[in-house]
Every structure is written in structure tokens, then in C-alpha cells.
Amino acid sequence: MDTTTSNPRIEASAKYIRMSPHKARRVVDQIRGRAYEQAPMILEFMPYRVCDSISQLLSSAAANANHNFGLSKTDLFIDAIQVDGGSFLKRIRSGARGRTYPIHKPTCHITIVMRMDSGWRNKISLRRFGK
């Protein structure tokens, strides 16, 4: 964790989330680069199961910023968020003639990096979306 007080780097990670990394990346791409206040609203209206895990992780990162650096949650934005593949849970399915077939249930690791919002980021996002 970066200990400089000018623009600290706040990290939070969740490991072994029982979701395919491909499905989690679909959700993560929607909130990357957004302000902290916008991200929970976006996640709330998305119909995917992984949104709950990402929302919990997001609130954990904001709590880390508040507790460790004394930053307000309104000043934060998501600088980086990444989804990496985890290990597979291996299960067995019964097959014909006494055979067994493997089932691989994927897991993923999600890492969020948040930073303090300096005013230029809001101007760029407003310009990008034409508001």
C-alpha cells in the first residue's frame, strides 16, 4: 500500500470467488474508471450474480480508505480493477457403464485499486459521455 498522503493507493482483494473469470470481467468492465458513488448504483441494477461480491469488495476498499487514510468515500474513484483466474473446484459426475466424468467449477480473484479523485477526472468523464 502506498503511504504517501498526496494521492494514496487503496487496495482490496477477494480470492476464490465462485464465478467464472469471463463472467466477472463482463461486470468489472462497466465500473472501471468510475467514481465510488456511481459504481454501487451501476452494480445494483445489473442482473449478474457476481455483482454482490464486487459490491462488497468495493465497500471494503472504501472502508480501508476511510480507516487507514481518513479519506472521504465521495473523493474516491476506481483506478484499476482486475479479475484473474483462480483454481478450479474439481467434482465428479457419474457416467454410463460405471464411468466418471470430471466437472471443473472455476473460481476467480478480484483486485480493486482506488485513488483519491482530483477534479480533472470528472471533467474528462463528462466530456467522454457528452454531458
From Swiss-Prot:
Provenance organism: Aneura mirabilis
Keyword annotations: Plastid, Ribonucleoprotein, Ribosomal protein, RNA-binding, rRNA-binding
Name the UniProt record assigns to this protein: Large ribosomal subunit protein uL22c
Top-level taxon of origin: Eukaryota
Family: Belongs to the universal ribosomal protein uL22 family.
Chief place of localization: plastid
The encoding gene: rpl22
PANTHER family: CHLOROPLAST 50S RIBOSOMAL PROTEIN L22-RELATED, LARGE RIBOSOMAL SUBUNIT PROTEIN UL22M
Keyword RNA-binding: yes
Record InterPro entries: Ribosomal_uL22, Ribosomal_uL22_bac/chlpt-type, Ribosomal_uL22_bac/org-type, Ribosomal_uL22_sf
A UniProt-annotated Pfam family: Ribosomal_L22
Gene3D superfamilies, per database record: Ribosomal protein L22/L17
Role noted for this protein: This protein binds specifically to 23S rRNA.
Example of a GO biological process term: translation
Subcellular location: Plastid
A GO MF label: structural constituent of ribosome
Subunit structure: Part of the 50S ribosomal subunit.
Cellular component, GO annotation: large ribosomal subunit; plastid
Disulphide-bonded residues: none
